[in-house]
Structures are given as C-alpha cells and as structure tokens.
Regions:
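Feature responds to low-complexity, polar/acidic, surface-exposed segments characteristic
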Residues: 1-3, 10-33, 37-66, 73-93, ...
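Catalytic cores of secreted/periplasmic or lumenal enzymes
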Residues: 135
Length: 183
C-alpha cells in the first residue's frame, strides 16, 4: 500500500538508508528521528523553519546526531533519567505527537489544535489525553488516518512504511495521492 509513498519520499531525499528496508517492521525511536531529521533539514534548506529551540541536549544511551537534533528542536523527548530509549518501538499515538511537533516547526504549516477529535474512532477511548490534540491535528491535516474498520489503534506499533508515508505527507503539502488507511 505504501510503495508510491516510499518511492516519492526516496526521490525527495527523505528516506535515510537505515530505514530503507524491512518496511513492514515497527520503527524505533532512533529510526523515526532519522526520518524527522531528514524533513527538518529539507525544510531548513527551503528556509521555512520557525525559530526552534536548539539548546544542548544529551542522553546517556545515545549520541545519535538525528536524535539530538530532534530533541533539541522539541520534536522528541527523552523517557526520563537522562535516557532516550533509541531502540524502543513507537506507537501510533506517539508518532502523531512527534509528527505534530515536527509540523509546528514549519512556518507554512497550519498549526491550530484542539482536544476534540473531528472523527469518532471506535477505539477513541484508548487514545491518551496527552495525544488527543496531536491525533486531531494529524488527522485533520490528512497526515495520519485510521487503520481500517474505523479504528486509530493508538497503542499499535508504527511501521517504517507508515512512518515514511506520513513524514512525506507532512513534508509535502502538495502531496497528490489520497491518503490510504495505514494497514
């Protein structure tokens, strides 16, 4: 389902080599940061970034440059006690939060939010309160959709192909393909 998105993201230079395979496997926090950092750098070249916090950030369990860039820009947070947990897989609601924070860095991306979901997912009660406004935003922007059968699956694993497709949608407001369910 995601082949066109993967091809388009590759053509735009948004798919780092470490995530350019095993597309149906869950994505780790570190690998998601590699995608987010690619978008961040592309926007920086296009001069569309808002002024972002770029304070010094460090973690005891990683010194990966993409992780540190995303953390200093406010796209991702640590997990506590100075750790990032780079090898931990992310959930769909965590991805929504990270995508929203990344989108907020682009001065051309509309960033209005509220906690009320525009669509009532059958599993909406499972969406955590901290993720509601982020899921609302990514859904309304057409960046993330449900997983089929009127579900969002907030605690479900987020795959590499889903990550590539949604970071491409966020990056390119001229995205010509209709978003599909992230099966």
């Amino acid at each position: 389902w995601a082949q066109k998105s993967v091809d388009a993201a590759r053509a735009a230079g948004l798919v780092p080599s470490q995530v350019d395979s095993a597309f149906d496997t869950p994505i780790t926090r570190e690998d998601f940061c590699s995608l987010a950092a690619a978008v961040y750098r592309a926007w920086d070249r296009e001069n569309v970034l808002q002024t972002a916090s770029t304070g010094k950030v460090s973690f005891t369990d990683t010194d990966n440059a993409d992780v540190l860039l995303c953390a200093s820009a406010g796209v991702v947070n640590g997990v506590g006690n100075g750790k990032f947990a780079p090898d931990k897989n992310i959930t769909r609601q965590e991805a929504a939060s990270m995508l929203h924070r990344l989108g907020a860095l682009n001065k051309n991306v509309k960033n209005d939010v509220n906690d009320r979901l525009p669509h009532v997912f059958a599993d909406g009660e499972k969406i955590r309160s901290w993720a509601r406004s982020d899921i609302n935003w990514v859904y309304r922007q057409g960046i993330m959709n449900g997983t089929g059968s009127n579900h969002f699956t907030p605690d479900g694993a987020y795959t590499r192909e889903q990550s590539i497709a949604t970071t491409l949608r966020l990056y390119d407001s001229r995205y010509a393909l209709a978003p599909e369910a992230e099966a």
